[in-house]
Amino acid sequence: MHPIQVPRRLLLRRQFLQVSGLSGISLLLGGCGLPLFESVVGKLSEPLNQKVEALLFNPQKLAPEFPPSAIEPEALLVNTFDFTPQINPATFRLKINGEVNNPISLSMVEIQQMPLSSMIIRHVCVEGWAAIVQWGGVQLRELLQLAQPKDTVRYAYFQSADGYYDSWDLASAAHPQTLMAYQKNGQPLSVDNGAPIRLASPIKLGYKQSKWVTEITLTSKLLPKKGYWEDQGYEWYAGL
């Protein structure tokens, strides 16, 4: 198994905002993607982000984590895109395909046999609220490595059982704190929170953290349909 090679030109946007002095704006507004924030930095498109990334992005830099005493059990609100799908964990398969040498389809039993990663992080919603949550699952990069991505891969697309879709840059998908989670606060993930498996990461806003993920497709290009909310005007990168 070979480690995923993350291209240097994929930008973690938060560091560009920090050095440019714009990060405080997002904090004052409760999250990126709000209208005023978009009017200020929304034009800083992905091509510009990628050009400056080589100077700024450390793909291994970790976001803050918290002690168990900081967990806020009731603070994570449940937002639904359309409906809550009912998925049988016994028959569920997570597919990873696209520009890979070894397309795979994994059961939850197979996923749960992989090393468990756990983190207590801040989940931040574009609506302006946040929650300290413990997530448990498998590092996404470990799953992607099983599919043997080709050297051309730059993006990961996520398809969910409810029809929701989104895409991430490969650097963020391969970040050590990006999980495919099947536990929340030490308990099996509930259906409302995305069971049997969902994205969880402290480096992206909440709408990037797809629930009920059924398929991950790796590509070399960012496709016209970038994400459900992004296609309606939300920021694509949505980094923290």
Where are these regions (language model features)?
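N-terminal secretory signal peptides
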Residues: 1-11, 15, 22-30
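Structured, non-membrane catalytic/scaffold regions adjacent to prosthetic-group chemistry
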Residues: 35-240
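Generic hydrophobic/packing signal
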Residues: 20, 25-26, 124, 225
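Low-complexity, intrinsically disordered/propeptide-like segments
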Residues: 13-14, 19-20, 30-32, 47, ...
